[in-house]
Amino acid sequence: MNKRRNLLNISDLTVDDVENITKLANQYLKKEVANSHILENKTVINLFFEDSTRTLASFEIAAKSLGANVVTLPIRSSSINKGEDLKDMIKTLNAMNPDYIIIRHKSSGIINTLAKYVNCSLINAGDGSSEHPTQALADYLVISNHKKQIKDLKVVICGDILHSRVARSNIRLLKMFGAEINLVAPPTLICKHFPEVDSVHYSLIEGIKDADVIMLLRLQKERMNNSSSEKEYFYLYGLDSQKLSYAKPDAIVMHPGPINRGIEISSDVADCVILQQVEFGLAIRKAVLHYYRPC
């Protein structure tokens, strides 16, 4: 069991933490965990202020399968809509003595602020364009199951880098293990403030040459003021089988979802390891709840 309470950012993790969590996740995938009800009599509260299918469902399934009592608060009918401050809402929920609060919110960095007001384990399920640590852990697990080692792998992250919490968490996590990180995006969607990044490209074909791993990102129009046409974007940055031929023959294509077929990826390359990312995401969230369980 980890002595630290919260998983807010990749910087909260050590190499040992990542290896222990992924080891647990592999055990859950293989159904090798001895105590499947390790969270019996524990309470998990899910607070999702942004839409979610994969992350919310997998946290719910993970917690219930481990024996926890799960409360997913419907935000649209919560006291937030009566004008309650988020800080006061968190303090109120904390007073009910849950064991975990899992939060997704549109504001970057807000979860780090809220951590000051809770006594339980706080897990970041995505905060604005800041971080999404459990998605990065799931992606790390997928890559580790397909490649012998992360060190020196050429990983290309392509798409809306500017608004992507998945990109930020993956860059930080994969760099911990020595991956070579390359970004591909239009100039308006790139973020150059990553000291961990090895190269930045504005051409997809140039960027994915000899790539081992290609991670595609959704255009996050909900976080944009304006954007290029979808047809133009796909022509320049959408991945299809012809563009994929520039990568290594055994390259894996990843996408955190939801997929927009015909925008960032064509149907002929969409069904690779993307569903495995979902499957492994569930195992990772079981492992995270297990690893951060209260005494």
UniProtKB/Swiss-Prot annotation:
Residues involved in carbamoyl phosphate binding: R54, T55, R104, H132, Q135, G257, P258
One GO CC term on file: cytosol
Family annotation (InterPro entries): Asp/Orn_carbamoyltranf_P-bd, Asp/Orn_carbamoylTrfase, Asp/Orn_carbamoylTrfase_sf, Asp_carbamoyltransf, Asp_carbamoyltransf_Asp/Orn-bd
Pathway: Pyrimidine metabolism; UMP biosynthesis via de novo pathway; (S)-dihydroorotate from bicarbonate: step 2/3
Leading EC class: transferase
Chaperone among keywords: no
Transmembrane stretches, start-end: none
Residues binding L-aspartate: K82, R165, R218
Annotated catalysed reactions: carbamoyl phosphate + L-aspartate = N-carbamoyl-L-aspartate + phosphate + H(+)
Keywords, sorted A to Z: Pyrimidine biosynthesis, Transferase
One biological process term in Gene Ontology: 'de novo' pyrimidine nucleobase biosynthetic process
Pfam families, per database record: OTCace (PF00185), OTCace_N (PF02729)
EC number of this enzyme: 2.1.3.2
One of the record's GO molecular function terms: amino acid binding
Gene3D superfamilies in alphabetical order: Aspartate/ornithine carbamoyltransferase
The UniProt record lists the keyword Cell membrane: no
Known role: Catalyzes the condensation of carbamoyl phosphate and aspartate to form carbamoyl aspartate and inorganic phosphate, the committed step in the de novo pyrimidine nucleotide biosynthesis pathway.
Binding partners and assembly: Heterododecamer (2C3:3R2) of six catalytic PyrB chains organized as two trimers (C3), and six regulatory PyrI chains organized as three dimers (R2).
Similarity-based family: Belongs to the aspartate/ornithine carbamoyltransferase superfamily. ATCase family.
Name recorded for this polypeptide: Aspartate carbamoyltransferase catalytic subunit
